[in-house]
Structures are given as structure tokens and as C-alpha cells.
């Protein structure tokens, strides 16, 4: 078998890494070694933050629902508990959207939660 020199393979691999490192500052986007190390760290942040994103959005939805419920004299936990008892089966994402965009519909949900006791 003939010996394969690494030139073209290395260049292709380095180009791939440097392409992914576009937008990084300074030598992190220009030099292969710095770009590679930065991409390793970026991958751990990507992995971590894909999971944190779910937590962050749920917290945002809860805050929006709580704000909407407090406008009608109720807090979040009693509102959610009342909805469960009333048999309203909407998730927090939808409830937050209704609270932000359709105040009349949210008022009806608050009334349902109050009567669901």
C-alpha cells in the first residue's frame, strides 16, 4: 500500500474547524489550535444551554401567568390549582401566550379557576 501524506486531509479538517469558528474574536477564528480549543468549549456550552433553555422558558411562562393572574386578584399557584380542578387542560406555554395577547380570554380562565374550587 502506498504511503498517504496528511496534507490534503489536514487542510480539509482545518478548513472545517476554521469555518465553524467564524465570528469568534481574534486568533480564535484565525489559528487552528485556538479555534479548535474554543470550539470544544463552545460544544459544552451548546449542550448545557439546550437543556437550560427549557428551564428558562418555563420560568418565563410562569412569570407571565403569575403577572396576568395577579391583575385579577389571584396568585399563580391558586390559579393553576383552580384550573386543574375546573378541568382546564392548557399548558403553561399557551396560558402565558393568552395572558400576554388576549386579556379577555385570560379573564375568563381566571373566572373558571375561581369557580373550579
Curated annotation (Swiss-Prot):
Gene3D superfamilies: 6.10.160.10, Ribosomal protein L20 (1.10.1900.20). GO terms for molecular function: rRNA binding; structural constituent of ribosome. Residues 8-21 have a biased composition (Basic residues). Transmembrane segments: none annotated. Keywords: Ribonucleoprotein, Ribosomal protein, RNA-binding, rRNA-binding. SUPFAM superfamilies: Ribosomal protein L20 (SSF74731). PROSITE patterns: RIBOSOMAL_L20 (PS00937). Residues 1-24 are annotated as: Disordered. Belongs to the bacterial ribosomal protein bL20 family. This is Large ribosomal subunit protein bL20. The lineage of its organism: Bacteria, Thermotogati, Deinococcota, Deinococci, Deinococcales.
